[in-house]
Every structure is written in C-alpha cells, then in structure tokens.
Regions:
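Membrane-interface transmembrane helices that cradle and orient dolichyl/undecaprenyl
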Residues: 317, 353-372
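Transmembrane-helix motifs of polytopic, lipid-linked glycan transferases
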Residues: 161-165, 296-319
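Interfacial juxtamembrane loops and adjacent helix segments
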Residues: 215-297
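Start-transfer (signal-anchor) and selected internal transmembrane alpha helices
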Residues: 1-33, 145-190
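Exposed low-complexity, polar/acidic, P/S/T/G-rich flexible segments that act as propeptides
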Residues: 30-36, 69-70, 74, 88-90, ...
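Membrane-interface alpha helices of multi-pass inner-membrane proteins
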Residues: 372-388, 393
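Short acidic/glycine- and proline-prone juxtamembrane loop motifs at membrane-interface regions
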Residues: 339-346
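Transmembrane-helix signature of polytopic, membrane-embedded enzymes
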Residues: 289-292, 311-332
Length: 393
C-alpha cells in the first residue's frame, strides 16, 4: 500500500489537495449548509424618521429565533458616498449574547451595495441618513451557499506548494525554480485579487508614469485611467461590490476624456523602470482588453521582470541561495512586484548586481571578468535611475 502511494504520489497529492480545498470551502459555507436561505426581504420594515432637521432611513427587524446573516444587500441611488450603521443583537460560538455595531457605505457609482456580516443574530437595525436626491429602494439579507473562487484558488496554490516543499526534494537543488513558481503563482493571485484601484504606496503616480510611457505621441486619457491617476474611487469590501467596480471601470475605460500631447517622444532615463509595465499596458490596448484586465496586465509586466532578474540572481549566487530565496519572497517585495512601482527594478537590479560583485570578489577562479564588471555597473546604474539618491553610494 505504502509503495503504491509512493509510486503514484503526485496523483495522490492532486486528489488530497482537491479534497482539502473542498473541505475548507464546505467549512466556510457551513452556516449556509445548515440553515441557508435566499433573500429575506427587509424592505417592508423600512421607515423614514426625522432627527432634528434631517431625515433618516431605519430598517429594524427582529426574530424570536436565532438566524444567520451572511450578507446584507441594499439597493438605491445616492449622489455621493454615505456611511450607514448596522446594529445587531448577535451570539458567538458559545451562545453569548452581545450588541454590536458595524458600518459600511453606499455611493453614486453603484445601485447595489453589500455588507458581509457572517453573524448569528436575533435582531438587526440599519440606519442611513436620507439626504436630498437619495433614495433607498430595497433591503434584504441572505445566507446562501456560495463557492468563493478566490479562496479556492489560494488554497489550491498553497497546498500545491506545500506538497512541493515537503515531498519534492529535487526542488531544493533548483531554488531558482522554486522561487519562479512561487512568485508567479502568488504574484498573479495578488494582481487579480486587488482589483482596479490604488493599493500600494504612491501607485497612482507610478500608474500615471507607466500609462504615459505606453503611448508614443498622444496620450489618450479615459475616465477610468483618470480615476486611478486621481485616486477617484469608492469603498468596496465584498466580492459583489468589486464585481460592480470592475464593470464600472470597464465602461469608464471606453469613455474618452481628452488627449494629452507628449512633449518628448524619447522617454527620460528616470522612467526606464516603467518600461515593462508600459509594454504590457500597450499590449492590453492592442488586444482590446477591458480596462480592469488591462490594468492587471500592466502589473504582470512588472512581476515578470522581477521573476526574471531574481531567478538569475538566485541561480548564479555562489553562497546564501536560501537567504536570497527568503529575501525575494518576502511579502512586501512580492506585493511591490505585483503593483505599479519602480521599486521592483531598484531592488532586483541592485540584488543581481550585488550577487555578481560577491561572485567576482570572493569566488573568482583566475581573473576578474571585465564583461561581468561592466554588466554589474550597468545594473547598478539602471537601478539608480529611478532613485538618484543611490548614485553616490
């Protein structure tokens, strides 16, 4: 039996990984499996109350029986972003009662708004100010069984890599390939999880530079691109709202706002770090991708550059390969490599340059290679272009 498992360990691993992922998804959906229900309409419990010289919507519902609310759903039209509060009488895993408060937002971009509550309650009260030109048309709650594709993809990737680390010992002889696979999988997950909004430090500035560089003479500014550049967005915190955001940005990506003429066709050396991102943005337009997909595609250019450079840094390193692997897979470095930024070029080029320097200084066989020294200087130079403060160092 054991020998058979060893012989077919990869097939067994696939089956086990699929089962574990399915079990986790079932556990996360356990409240829906045990007591699931479709939309419970709370609109009939909605009233408009006066508070001073203002009006507010109040939706108050209580039940003699405990019930599970996975998601709250509000529908309506609003002139801008407003907060609403949720008061619940809820029960924890030990059946201890408590009164809790939560808040979320509605906005002018969408007509449907969602809040993940995931609580067992006996009462819920939603309060939302009623400004001029605002209308709340419907409120409901639900506890539906739903497969979360993002969670499924994450655990499939995590378990697969865990299997490789524990049972595929050959991979330790090729640490650069372990890095490449890990960075590619989790980098892509980061890119497609974070949605078409600003996420990393100063990402709106870096996107602006990459977007401009992706055009030759005239820059076609769409409403969606300007939303990213100007950090004009709305608050989203659920899958359903992010789906609405993608649809909104895709439509805004078709709206031409104005054309900006480039002063210089030849790019400055300070923007060389954005070339991979600009190339992939350009390819996204050539292939007529939606704005959301094009925005993610531009980040893939940055990720592939990071993987390529650090792959060779780990591969050619004479010592401390495991340390380099740990360094390159640190969450911040991988997150930046999956974003719009110049830091990826700075970090990866400097790292590869340092590896070449260490190899030449401490592990040379006969004499120092002039070609490698020139290449090392070139790496340091290009890496310093975006952050000139490093040049004196």
């Amino acid at each position: 039996m054991i020998e058979t498992i060893k012989k077919h360990k990869r097939i067994v691993a696939v089956v086990v990984i699929l089962i574990l992922t399915a079990v986790i998804e079932l556990i996360c959906n356990f409240p829906a499996i045990r007591g699931g229900y479709d939309d419970l309409d709370l609109t009939k419990y909605m009233t408009v109350e006066e508070e001073g010289n203002r009006e507010k919507y109040v939706i108050s519902y209580s039940s003699p029986q405990k019930f599970y609310i996975k998601e709250l759903h509000l529908s309506g039209t609003f002139p801008k972003e407003y907060y609403y509060t949720i008061k619940t009488k809820e029960y924890n895993s030990f059946d201890k009662e408590s009164e809790e408060y939560y808040s979320d937002t509605v906005n002018s971009w969408f007509s449907d708004f969602y809040t993940n509550l995931n609580k067992k309650v006996t009462s819920v009260e939603i309060t939302l100010n009623k400004p001029e030109n605002a209308e709340l048309t419907a409120v409901s709650c639900s506890n539906k069984f739903e497969i979360n594709k993002y969670r499924v993809l994450f655990f499939l990737a995590a378990f697969s890599l865990l299997y490789c680390l524990l049972f595929e010992k050959k991979i330790y002889k090729k640490l650069e390939w372990l890095f490449a696979v890990y960075a590619l999988i989790f980098g892509l997950l980061l890119i497609f999880y974070v949605q078409p909004v600003k996420n990393s430090w100063d990402e709106q500035i870096h996107f602006d530079n990459a977007y401009k560089l992706s055009f030759t003479k005239n820059i076609d500014w769409t409403e969606a691109a300007l939303n990213i550049k100007n950090i004009n967005t709305v608050t989203c915190n659920t899958k359903a709202e992010y789906a609405e955001l993608r649809e909104y940005m895709n439509q805004a990506g078709k709206v031409h706002v104005y054309t900006e003429k480039k002063e210089n066709i030849v790019p400055s050396y300070t923007v060389l770090a954005y070339v991979p991102q600009a190339i992939f943005l350009k390819l996204g337009r050539i292939f007529h991708f939606s704005f959301s997909l094009m925005y993610a595609f531009g980040k893939i250019g940055n990720l592939l550059l990071y993987i390529s450079v650090m792959f060779w840094a780990i591969k050619i390193a004479k010592i401390k390969q495991l340390f380099l692997l740990f360094l390159t897979l640190m969450p911040t470095n991988l997150f930046l490599a999956s974003s719009y930024t110049y830091d990826t070029v700075v970090f990866s080029f400097f790292t590869l340059g340092c590896v070449i320097w260490v190899n030449e200084m401490f592990f040379y066989e006969s004499k120092t290679s002039a070609k490698k020294i020139i290449f090392m200087i070139l790496l340091f130079t290009i890496g310093s272009f975006s952050k000139a403060v490093y040049i004196p160092i």
